């Protein structure tokens, strides 16, 4: 994890494997800021959806005890959302470097769509 201080706030950039490990230990909340369509097609199991287009920092859940890690497709939108949170007064915020693309490149599991049925299914990439 890389950390920098921005205007008095701590901004963290997490690698996908770090996010997965912390999420498995119930230490973080993952928020996906992609569109509902992107989320429906594939997403990290357990991630909450808060699309950037409708995002308001004041609507975030409490960070007491669990930091929020934002992610998007590439890391661009999640960084913008994290910056908006810092501007709104959050003192610690994080995003996942490389976004969902990096998550898949790291061969981490996710929920995708079964092309035969259209039903969601957990995808366990192989190395």
Model-derived features: positions:
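Rhodanese-like catalytic fold shared by cysteine-dependent sulfurtransferases
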Residues: 1-29, 36-67, 76-127
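Short, surface-exposed ligand- or partner-binding patches at beta-edge/loop junctions that are enriched
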Residues: 71
């Amino acid at each position: 994890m890389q950390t920098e201080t921005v205007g008095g706030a701590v901004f963290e950039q997490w690698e996908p494997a770090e996010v997965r490990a912390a999420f498995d230990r119930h230490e973080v909340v993952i928020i996906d800021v992609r569109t509902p369509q992107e989320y429906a097609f594939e997403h990290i199991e357990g991630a909450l959806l808060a699309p950037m287009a409708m995002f308001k920092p004041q609507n975030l859940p409490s960070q007491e005890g669990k930091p929020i890690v934002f992610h998007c497709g590439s890391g661009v939108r999640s960084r913008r959302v994290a910056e908006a949170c810092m501007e709104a007064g959050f003192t610690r915020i994080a995003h996942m470097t490389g976004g969902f693309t990096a998550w898949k490149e790291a061969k981490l599991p996710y929920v995708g769509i079964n092309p035969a049925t259209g039903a969601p299914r957990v995808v366990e990439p192989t190395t």
